[in-house]
Regions:
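A C-terminal functional module that forms or caps the active site or interfaces directly
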Residues: 148, 153-173
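Phosphate/pyrophosphate-binding betaalpha-module
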Residues: 67-125
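General beta-strand structural signal in soluble alpha/beta enzymes
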Residues: 14-19, 36-38, 61-65, 82, ...
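N-terminal short beta-loop-beta anion/metal-coordinating cradle
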Residues: 1-47
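Active-site rim beta-loop-alpha module in soluble metabolic enzymes
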Residues: 104-156
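Non-transmembrane, aqueous-exposed alpha-helical and coiled segments at domain scale
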Residues: 20-22, 50-51, 58, 88, ...
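Flexible, glycine/proline-enriched loop segments at strand-loop-helix junctions
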Residues: 36-40, 95-106, 154-158
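Hydrophobic alpha-helical segments and helix pairs
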Residues: 43-83
Length: 173
């Protein structure tokens, strides 16, 4: 099931894609053309769609909206998290493009724009690193501190999700 909750915000929305069952609608928002599209879950899925959007359709920017599991007691359900980096143990980026670092960073200009827009709209955002993992639910462990506690404490990760590292490393090529 895709989250199509943004469609009502578009004027004159038209279905423009059904390939692989992934729906995309294009319309206008404040007079500017905007496309809203599902991406599936995980780096391989967003990898397919983001690659095609950037390389074949020449999109200007992708803003990923999705869910994350909190590593911080400060983050509550429905809070908005602005990623200042994505940390990952995944080998997806290395296999896909040769990117062999465990952390990627967003566009400063795009984050500045998101921050300014949120401020103008009165939306509170929590900012910090996030953990971009191939595994959303890990098996319980007797290890202390746990893997996620290390990421939270040593790398400052606020939450776990499964797509951001790929989205951010796409900015490099």
């Amino acid at each position: 099931m895709q989250n199509l909750s943004l469609i009502p915000f578009l004027q004159d929305a038209v279905l423009v894609n059904e390939v692989r069952g992934m729906l995309a609608y294009t319309g206008t928002y404040n007079g500017k053309p905007v496309t809203v599209m599902g991406s599936g879950m995980g780096m391989p899925s967003i990898g397919i769609y983001s690659y095609e959007l950037f390389k074949e359709y020449d999109v200007d920017r992708i803003i990923r909206i999705g869910s994350a599991g909190s590593y911080s007691s400060d983050a509550k359900i429905y809070d908005v998290v602005l990623a200042t980096s994505a940390v990952s143990e995944s080998t997806y980026a290395k296999v896909q493009s040769g990117y062999d670092k465990d952390e990627s960073y967003p566009s400063k200009a795009l984050n500045d724009s998101l921050r300014a827009t949120a401020k103008r709209l009165g939306i509170n955002m929590i900012e910090g690193a996030i953990h971009s993992s191939d595994v959303f639910y890990r098996q319980p462990s007797d290890e202390k501190p746990t893997y996620w506690e290390k990421l939270r404490d040593e790398r400052g990760c606020l939450a776990v999700e499964m797509e951001a590292l790929h989205c951010l490393q796409m900015l490099l090529y």
